[in-house]
Amino acid sequence: MIASGRHQWTNDYPAEHDIKDDINNGNAYVLTVDGEVAVYGAVALNGEPQYDFIDGDWLTTGDYYVIHRFATLPSFQREGLARIFISKVNSMCEVEKIPSIKVDTNFDNTPMINLLSSMGFCICGRVNYGGNRGQRFAFEKLSIAMEPAE
């Protein structure tokens, strides 16, 4: 991420302890290809306190899954695997009746912005992490279709 000139992450984030915390909390998910990890993401239920302070408006106010520390290994990029990972998170939402997925990304992370936009995520505003992490675009996607009342 840093090598590509994007400011999504810093030299100290994410750190090894962040990934270990994801694993210990049951939030670490991987997509594998032939037994090799291709995509990693931390997926947590209602797992981002900063989202309570959005400069904007979320589509929903209920439960959500958040995806953090989302990365595709370079040797697997441009194969559609990030899209598959997010689709699987959407399936988790449908099974568990969680109405949406929320994600934030840095303003210069064009590949992620394009991926989210192409998958039906809406930009809802900005969240501010302060310090080196600063502001991020905040995205949300509804995962369960609304049905008319009868």
Segments from the language model and where they lie:
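Conserved acyl-donor/pantetheine-binding loop and adjacent beta-alpha core of acyl/acetyltransferases
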Residues: 42-69, 77
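Conserved acetyl-CoA-binding loop-helix of GNAT-fold acetyltransferases
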Residues: 72, 78-91, 114-118
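Conserved catalytic-core motifs of GNAT/GCN5-like acyltransferases
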Residues: 104-105, 117-137
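Conserved GNAT acetyl-CoA-binding A-motif
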Residues: 86, 93-105
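Conserved beta-hairpin
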Residues: 27-44
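Conserved beta-strand-loop-alpha-helix junction that forms the acyl-donor binding cleft
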Residues: 77, 103-113, 130
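Conserved GNAT-fold acetyl-CoA-binding loop/helix
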Residues: 1-21
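Residue-level recognition of the GNAT/N-acetyltransferase active site
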Residues: 68, 73, 104-106
